[in-house]
Structure formats: structure tokens, C-alpha cells
């Protein structure tokens, strides 16, 4: 857990983002020949938003899905190289104390995560067993060991697709390649992630797969970037029963700033805060955090066209506006600190 020593090491309040796709942009820029992307572009932007800690995920884009291991290692190599080149402002961390030390040095701390694990079923020399294969479950640990040496602290079994581990939240109309929900392989991987102390993230899983994770792991889980389905009825958001279960297990729900998960008509800053209020009313403020999922630096369409400029939350520079509005809505400084970093550090300290 985050103890008083760790708390005392943090000089000021800061914001932790439970979900960032920055690694994707870093990889694309480096492929074009750019270097020190964090130092030149992202560190100043993150500081402007008060964000000093985040989970930086490796996400294999759909166009690379048939060669996931290769793309995953490209993303990992790009991220590690850029962090090394930008070491004056950013550092990979693996626990709460390391993050606190990094912040004290004036740097930004990155926890390494993976957004989807299709790569594990395609890993070289790893073929899914057709019959009893005692060596199979030992071989699948190889990619986890490779990532573990790089500092992996977080994992999602799938993105929106269905793979050989689980069903994604957007795979309901796709051809079924395995039975709906967690597969036996997915259950084994889930148990191994838990054994290694890696944060298991149920964002992007469909309801049946979330149920499977809950059956396999009787401990803390997170939903890094998901909202309340009751307020915005899309499959990517969480049902009330899953929100309650995450809270019961001591986890956190990171509220997502992606417009389509906030409201279908008015995805405003205040509606974002409504999701915070809704989840906090059900499981307590100690189990809510920020998982912004900002994509303004990627080639995406503008999704905030229905919101007035002062009601937008679409880039990291908008985070101070969110904090001010939380104060105006009646949140205390202690509550805002819990949302911003205290809850996340507590959970990461449990793993």
C-alpha cells in the first residue's frame, strides 16, 4: 500500500492518468526519423496539465493485428529508446515509491502497460494446443517475462476485438473464433498476470469476459478508462454490478474523457464530472480516478463539436479546467487529490 513514507516523498499534488496512448505517437514519430519525442513534445504538455504520472500502454493497431508480436516489440523498442533519450524529463517506474522519487526529481513517471494481448497467441514458437500439452502453459510465460524485464505493470487481455484469450466489448457482431468470454487460455493468462503482480485491467472487455476475470482473480482489479453505462449506454462502459465489484475488491475506475463514452448528445466537462459523481456514489470516492484516453495527437476526428470551448476535455492542457470545475461542483481538495493520484498510488502499491 502507499504508506506515509511514500506520501511524504510527494512534494505537491499532481495528476495521474490511468490510460495514455502516447507510446503510439512516439513510435510513429520515431519511424519518421524524429528523436527525443518526449523531451521535445510531450513532457511540457504533460506538465502544463499537471500530469506527472501515467500508464503508457503498448497498443497494437488493427492493421498490425496479424503480426502482433513484431509490432509490439517495435512499440516497446521505440518507447524505451525515447525514454532513454529524454531521460531529463521522463522515466519508466515500476512502483509507487519509484514514481514519488521520479516526481521529486522533476520528471514524469511512466508505468508500462499493454492494451490487448493478441500478441501472446502469435508469439514465436507458441502454438495453441490442440490436445493436452503440458509444455504449452510454460512456453506462454516467455512474452510475459520479456515484458516484465522491461517493467510491465499493467495488462488488458484484449482491445475491442475478440482473440484467443477473451472477448472485447466491440466484438459482439464479429465472427466468433472462440466461445464468448474468457477462454481456458485466457483464464490461465489471467491467473499468471495476477501471480506476477501485474494490474489486471477490464476496460475493453465485454461483460462475459469481465465475469471470467472476476471468477479467476479474487483480488484488486481496475478499469483504467471506462465510464458508467447507466449514464451513457454503450458496451464499452461498465454495468453497475461491475462497478460495484471493482469497488468491493479495492480497485479503481478511471473515468474516460472520450466523448462517445460520456454522452451521445452533450459530451461536456460537466457530464464527465457526472460520471465521477455517479461512480463515487456507488463505491466511494476512494475508488475513482482519471483515465483520460486523450487522442488529440493522433489522427482522429473531432468528437467535441457539440461542446462549447469552456466545456471541453479533449487534451491534457484541459486538465486544470477540470480540477477548477470539480472545486466549483463542491469537491474538496482532499477529494480532488484522491481522484488525481492518491487512489491510483494506493492500488498500484497493492500489486
Label each region the model flagged:
Residues 178-214, 223-225:
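Loop-centered beta-sheet repeat module
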Residues 200, 216, 246-248:
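Short gly/pro-enriched beta-turn/loop segments at secondary-structure junctions
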Amino acid at each position: 500500500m502507499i504508506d506515509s513514507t511514500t506520501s511524504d516523498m510527494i512534494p505537491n499534488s499532481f495528476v495521474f492518468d490511468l490510460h495514455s496512448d502516447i507510446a503510439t505517437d512516439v513510435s510513429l514519430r520515431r519511424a519518421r526519423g524524429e528523436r527525443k519525442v518526449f523531451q521535445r513534445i510531450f513532457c511540457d504538455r504533460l506538465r502544463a496539465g499537471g500530469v506527472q504520472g501515467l500508464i503508457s500502454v503498448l497498443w497494437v493497431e488493427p492493421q498490425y493485428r496479424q503480426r502482433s508480436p513484431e509490432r509490439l516489440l517495435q512499440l516497446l523498442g521505440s518507447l524505451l529508446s525515447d525514454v532513454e533519450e529524454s531521460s531529463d524529463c521522463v522515466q519508466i517506474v515500476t512502483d509507487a515509491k519509484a514514481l514519488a522519487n521520479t516526481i521529486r526529481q522533476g520528471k514524469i513517471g511512466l508505468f508500462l502497460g499493454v492494451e490487448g494481448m493478441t500478441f501472446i497467441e502469435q508469439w514465436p514458437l507458441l502454438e495453441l494446443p490442440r490436445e493436452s500439452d503440458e509444455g504449452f502453459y510454460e512456453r506462454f510465460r516467455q512474452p510475459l517475462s520479456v515484458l516484465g524485464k522491461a517493467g510491465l505493470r499493467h495488462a488488458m487481455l484484449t482491445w475491442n476485438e475478440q482473440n484467443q484469450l477473451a472477448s472485447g466489448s466491440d466484438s459482439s457482431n464479429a465472427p466468433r473464433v472462440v466461445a464468448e468470454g474468457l477462454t481456458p487460455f485466457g483464464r490461465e493468462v489471467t491467473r499468471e498476470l495476477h501471480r506476477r503482480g501485474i494490474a489486471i485491467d477490464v476496460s475493453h472487455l465485454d461483460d462475459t469476459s469481465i465475469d471470467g476475470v472476476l471468477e479467476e482473480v479474487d483480488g484488486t482489479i481496475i478499469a483504467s478508462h471506462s465510464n458508467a453505462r447507466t449514464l451513457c449506454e454503450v458496451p464499452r462502459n461498465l454495468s453497475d454490478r461491475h462497478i460495484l465489484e471493482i469497488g468491493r475488491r479495492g480497485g479503481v475506475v478511471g473515468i474516460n474523457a472520450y466523448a462517445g463514452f460520456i454522452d451521445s448528445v452533450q459530451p461536456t466537462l460537466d457530464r464527465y464530472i457526472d460520471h465521477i459523481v455517479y461512480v463515487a456514489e456507488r463505491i466511494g470516492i476512494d475508488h475513482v480516478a482519471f483515465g483520460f484516453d486523450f487522442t488529440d495527437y493522433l489522427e482522429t476526428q473531432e468528437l467535441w463539436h457539440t461542446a462549447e470551448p469552456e466545456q471541453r476535455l479533449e487534451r491534457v492542457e484541459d486538465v486544470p479546467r477540470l480540477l477548477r470545475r470539480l472545486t466549483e461542483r463542491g469537491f474538496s481538495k482532499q477529494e480532488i487529490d484522491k481522484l488525481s493520484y492518491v487512489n491510483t498510488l494506493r492500488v498500484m502499491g497493492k500489486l
